[in-house]
Amino acid sequence: MSDTQNLEQLLEALMDAEDPKEVRRIAGSILTLDGSHPAGHLALWELMEEEESLNSLGQLEKALEETRKRVGGAPASLYDENPLTEIYGALLMHLAFGFHAKEELERALAFAQDLVAFDDEGVYPGRTVFYRCLLDLKQYDRILEALEEDPLETPVGEHARTLALLETKGVCDETMEALLNALSLDTNLPFLILDLTILPEEDEELGAELEETFHQAVYLQTPWTETQERASFLALPTLILGSLTGRLEQEDQEALEEMLKDSGLEDGVARLQAQAAERDADEDPDERDQWAMEELMKLLLPEGN
């Protein structure tokens, strides 16, 4: 068997390997045959503990440079048949999140921007770190410009839009409309951001969908809670939504009642709560959320929006 054929078999085996010892063995064999192969270096980096991995981002930068050299810049698309296509996306993802963790925001943003440009379907969580970097850098106009060009409408993007509008235009109908649109895209997300959701025990599975939402919440929590104005702006519609969908603990319900005082919304919320109480207790949660969001929009937005 030629070295090329052997290398191809090792790369296939690496994709299927799950045991860390097996991954390390296969990656070592790949690098014995091809000392600069990005797949081998990426696999070994992913086995590192967090501190070591952050101190070894230079290893990933070299692997990315080698990947770009081998594919002629960047893969044509997510579905480019070149075996390095997935490696390219993974390297950009790790570099963006890694440099953000090290608070090297401009470097993180550069890798995140490349990942978003490459991934127009949201396969990688690049938009999460991309918009978080822009929020950290307080580049609010750039957030709004990026959203105009982004082919995807995502919860994290719409939360970033809301925060950008809140900073550039303040509390207004446009900002509230943006927030309600963000909530409608993932109704669980604001509860995680505000720590209003009881998560499963550590040994229980979150489920793929909730895991993705949790990851987004981790990156949105700091921007949303940076000021009291931001936190309050998110909290009121979130608490109303929670009261209509059975998500609130007693103390959260009391917090809502306090926020409703002098808001002019008490009667409207009480009416909706009465309607919610009359709905089928076994109603599908997604249908309940859809009803609640429709009513929330009617309550908080002027007619015609």
Residue ranges and their predicted role:
Residues 164-305:
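Long, ordered, amphipathic alpha-helical scaffolds
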Residues 30-33, 60-85, 116-118:
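Flexible helix-coil transition and linker loops at the boundaries of alpha-helical arrays
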Residues 40, 91, 124-126, 157, ...:
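TPR alpha-solenoid repeat register
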Residues 17, 50-51, 102, 137, ...:
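Structural motif corresponding to the intra-repeat A-B loop/turn of tetratricopeptide repeats
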Residues 52-69, 116-120, 135, 148-155, ...:
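TPR/TPR-like (Sel1-like) alpha-helical repeat modules
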